[in-house]
């Protein structure tokens, strides 16, 4: 009687047999289906030579090919796939035509975690850093495809065609069976793709590789919102109408993080304004934290002693609790992530390192708007983020910096430092931005800031009483200037937790900060008592408030009114002169850009501005 075989052999005997073998007998296909699309079915398979599990992709030729031209096109694309070698492009091993069964088969690497869409649905809590890593990998693959001559266009990029190895955090672009090579005119002439991810120019049948950037933006939108783009539409015709009309998916408005939203908007912008994959890879949004620049500021030590000084609500989007949101800006230990000896850009004071450190980043939204991000970290490693748009036509660095100082409990001297950093960021995008503008307008902004505080007091009081919109723990509030911001620390809670700032000497300070109990005629603003101008001190003609530094200052109302009116007239005239000069500069630029194709003007202007800024910096002693 033969001996009983070990259990391991029984398991081997139960292994499924190959349903099909390739002509070389190297690859065997199982019946297990890994995925299925409109034209293609993906089976689990095995490479007997290397001992690897692989994916067997099978396309029914009769389903998509009607003539020899179509067949030759697919053959050429399959041959193309064999030449693609990149870490973020799916590996292609072999292919052949099965005339008997009317199939085209090709073997690719298999992925343990399925598609990016499946992976994202499975893992609900993903940090924004992970999304950035995925984005960098996808864009890296697109850079490789688009750098071919002529470029390779995917034309059907979506989360269902991006694959994941979850144990390595690795993503790769796949399903390149629909890719095409651009002709000599560098444009394609066929509509192929998924409507939700198709750029407007695809419908016009005149497009280039930038359609993949649009699709990438829609992929990122789906990853952030868990919604298919244009899910509000019930059919492809409705999607086509919205896309043709320039209407963005409704899910875009649901994104709370303004940085994420603006980055997606860059990707799905009009073709003439859309950035390339290489340009997007260099975008500040995707930059590693190690590339950030840190500016130490002299902190208000009196204010920092307050119990809640590191948790105050500051700016338009504030992330305090790093564990409270699934997709968020990481605010972990600042000391561990960003050693100050490597990243400090400039130092105002030898003791500055013991105070707050601020990171300044910027993104150009359009010709008139720059999105600024300030990250403030204290000596304990706690960090706070402020996001706000800067309108180069309406805002000045001094006005924004003055408001920030009040919100952040910094010293009055820090106004100039913050303004200079804002100016530096703006000049990175607009080299001819007038540095002296902030100095010239400083007096005007300071004078008006007092009036604005007085006039806006009633308005902000009403806003505080209104039911605020709440989403994911963030409460929408308003600054005195009218700007909106979002905070997970409602204003009234902060007012109760912060101690008021005391001046270093007795009496009224020049910046209007009073000692506690010096007067009851103050309004608490994020822990800082700000002296509001007395209505009688506001000139009725000019509306400019004068803040007295001593009881005897400006006793003569006529002198005050005369000085105020003359000063306002002068500042208004200077501002108009700057506006005229800015308009002239803009017109001069437009004249030169007429020699550049319209779809390349924005890209050319941005590139030349950066070069001009580099030249200006190199010319400085």
Curated annotation (Swiss-Prot):
InterPro entries: Kinase-like_dom_sf (IPR011009), Kinase_OSR1/WNK_CCT (IPR024678), Prot_kinase_dom (IPR000719), Ser/Thr_kinase_AS (IPR008271), WNK_Ser-Thr_kinase (IPR050588)
Substrates-to-products reaction catalysed: L-seryl-[protein] + ATP = O-phospho-L-seryl-[protein] + ADP + H(+); L-threonyl-[protein] + ATP = O-phospho-L-threonyl-[protein] + ADP + H(+)
Keywords, comma-separated and alphabetical: ATP-binding, Kinase, Nucleotide-binding, Serine/threonine-protein kinase, Transferase
Organism encoding this protein: Oryza sativa subsp. japonica
Lineage summary: Eukaryota, Viridiplantae, Streptophyta, Embryophyta, Tracheophyta
Limits of the Protein kinase domain: 28-286
EC number: 2.7.11.1
Signal peptide extent: none
Region (Disordered): 438-490, 501-520, 527-553, 600-621
Any one of the GO BP annotations: intracellular signal transduction
Gene Ontology CC terms, in alphabetical order: cytoplasm
CDD domains listed in its UniProt record: STKc_WNK (cd13983)
Residues that bind ATP: 108-111, 158
Name of the featured protein: Probable serine/threonine-protein kinase WNK2
């Amino acid at each position: 009687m033969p001996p009983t075989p070990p259990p391991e052999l029984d398991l081997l005997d139960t292994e499924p047999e190959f349903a099909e073998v390739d002509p070389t007998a190297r690859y065997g296909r199982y019946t297990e289906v890994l995925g299925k699309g409109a034209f293609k079915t993906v089976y689990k398979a095995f490479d007997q030579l290397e001992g690897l599990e692989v994916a067997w992709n099978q396309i029914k030729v009769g389903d998509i090919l009607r003539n020899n031209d179509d067949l030759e096109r697919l053959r050429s694309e399959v041959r193309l796939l064999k030449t693609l070698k990149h870490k973020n492009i799916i590996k292609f091993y072999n292919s052949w035509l099965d005339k008997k069964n009317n199939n085209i088969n090709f073997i690719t690497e298999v992925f343990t975690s399925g598609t990016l869409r499946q992976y994202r649905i499975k893992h609900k809590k993903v940090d924004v850093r992970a999304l950035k890593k995925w984005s960098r990998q996808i864009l890296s693959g697109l850079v490789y495809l688009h750098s071919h001559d002529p470029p390779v266009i995917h034309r059907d990029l979506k989360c269902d065609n991006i694959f994941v190895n979850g144990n390595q955090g690795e993503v790769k672009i796949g399903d390149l069976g629909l890719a095409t090579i651009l002709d000599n005119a560098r444009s394609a002439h066929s509509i192929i793709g998924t409507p939700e991810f198709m750029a407007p120019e695809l419908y016009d049948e005149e497009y280039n590789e930038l359609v993949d950037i649009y699709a990438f933006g829609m992929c990122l939108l789906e990853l952030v919102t868990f919604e298919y783009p244009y899910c509000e539409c019930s059919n492809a015709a409705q999607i086509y109408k919205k896309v043709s009309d320039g209407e963005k998916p409704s899910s875009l408005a649901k994104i709370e993080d303004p940085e994420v939203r603006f980055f997606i908007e860059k990707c799905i912008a009009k073709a003439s304004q859309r950035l390339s994959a290489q340009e997007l890879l260099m975008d500040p949004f995707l930059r590693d934290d190690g590339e950030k620049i840190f500016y130490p500021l002299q902190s208000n030590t009196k204010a920092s002693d307050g119990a809640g000084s590191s948790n105050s609500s500051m700016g338009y989007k504030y992330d305090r609790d790093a564990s409270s949101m699934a997709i968020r800006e990481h605010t972990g230990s600042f000391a561990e992530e960003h050693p100050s000896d490597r990243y400090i850009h400039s130092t105002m004071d030898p003791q500055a390192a013991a105070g707050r450190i601020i990171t300044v980043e910027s993104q150009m939204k359009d010709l008139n708007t720059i999105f600024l991000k300030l990250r403030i970290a204290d000596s304990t490693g706690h960090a706070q983020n402020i996001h706000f748009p800067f309108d180069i036509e309406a805002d000045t660095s001094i006005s924004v910096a003055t408001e920030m100082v009040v919100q952040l409990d910094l010293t009055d001297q820090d106004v100039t430092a913050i303004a200079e950093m804002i100016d530096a960021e703006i000049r990175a995008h607009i080299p001819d931005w007038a540095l002296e503008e902030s100095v010239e307008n400083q007096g005007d902004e300071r004078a008006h800031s007092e009036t604005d505080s007085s006039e806006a007091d009633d308005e902000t009081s009403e806003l505080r009483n209104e039911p605020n919109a709440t989403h994911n723990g963030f409460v929408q509030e308003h600054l005195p200037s009218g700007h909106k911001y979002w905070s997970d620390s409602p204003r009234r809670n902060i007012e109760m937790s912060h101690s008021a700032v005391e001046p270093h000497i007795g009496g009224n300070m020049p910046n209007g900060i009073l000692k506690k109990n010096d007067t009851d005629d103050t309004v608490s603003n994020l822990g800082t008592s700000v002296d509001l101008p007395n209505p009688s001190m506001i000139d009725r003609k000019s509306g400019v408030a004068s803040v007295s530094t001593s009881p005897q200052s400006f006793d003569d109302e006529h002198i005050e009114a005369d000085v105020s009116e003359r000063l306002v007239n002068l500042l208004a005239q200077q501002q108009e002169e700057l506006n005229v000069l800015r308009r002239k500069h803009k017109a001069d630029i437009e004249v030169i850009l007429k020699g550049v194709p319209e779809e390349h003007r924005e890209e050319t202007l941005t590139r030349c501005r950066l070069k001009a800024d580099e030249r200006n910096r190199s010319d400085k002693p």
